[in-house]
A protein has these predicted regions:
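Short, charged juxtamembrane terminal tails flanking transmembrane helices
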Residues: 1, 130-141
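Transmembrane alpha-helical insertion/packing segments
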Residues: 1-42
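Membrane-helix interface and helix-disruption motif detector
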Residues: 24-33, 55-56, 81-86, 105-112
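Canonical alpha-helical transmembrane segments
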Residues: 36-65
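Transmembrane alpha-helical segments in integral membrane proteins
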Residues: 44-45, 114-134
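Hydrophobic alpha-helical membrane-insertion segments
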Residues: 61-83
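Short hydrophobic, aromatic-rich alpha-helical segments embedded in or entering the lipid bilayer
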Residues: 87-103
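Hydrophobic alpha-helical transmembrane segments
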Residues: 99-123
Length: 141
């Protein structure tokens, strides 16, 4: 496995946080360019899950399922109770999971669209993982 693959999600997360920082200062994330950064960020996580070691794939998959529940609850709170400031905690949490990181982009007008994109990314990453069963085939020299 290539060592640089581990740097992809972290670099993508840093880019997403950096791109969103001005938006938070000015008054919330801007949908257009934020969407582009976040989609690239989710693709990096999907590549990592697809090419990482089996052990890391299991660990990250478990984190994703837990994070999806937390993110869903948070998005519900943000949209229902108009808690835009609550999103400020998500850049740091995005280092743990892209499903939490996607909340960088969620605002009152786009939650369903971003949620749909997140589900597509998760479906791709988990559905296209290599088999977790050990390879029993012998290589012929």
């Amino acid at each position: 496995m290539k060592k640089w693959i581990f740097a992809l999600p972290v670099a993508a997360t840093a880019a997403a946080i950096a791109a969103n920082a001005p938006g938070f200062i000015v008054g919330g994330p801007q949908p257009g360019w934020t969407l582009a950064v976040t989609m690239g960020y989710l693709v990096c996580w999907a590549v990592f899950l697809r090419n990482g070691t089996v052990r890391w794939q299991r660990i990250i998959s478990r984190i994703w399922w837990i994070a999806s529940a937390v993110c869903s609850a948070a998005c519900f709170c943000v949209v229902t109770f108009d808690l835009d400031g609550f999103l400020m905690i998500f850049p740091a949490l995005g280092l743990v999971s892209p499903l939490l990181g996607i909340a960088l982009c969620v605002n009152n007008h786009y939650p369903l669209f971003y949620g749909f994109c997140t589900l597509l990314a998760v479906w791709y990453a988990i559905g296209s993982r290599p088999s977790l069963k050990p390879d029993t085939t012998e290589e012929v020299n």
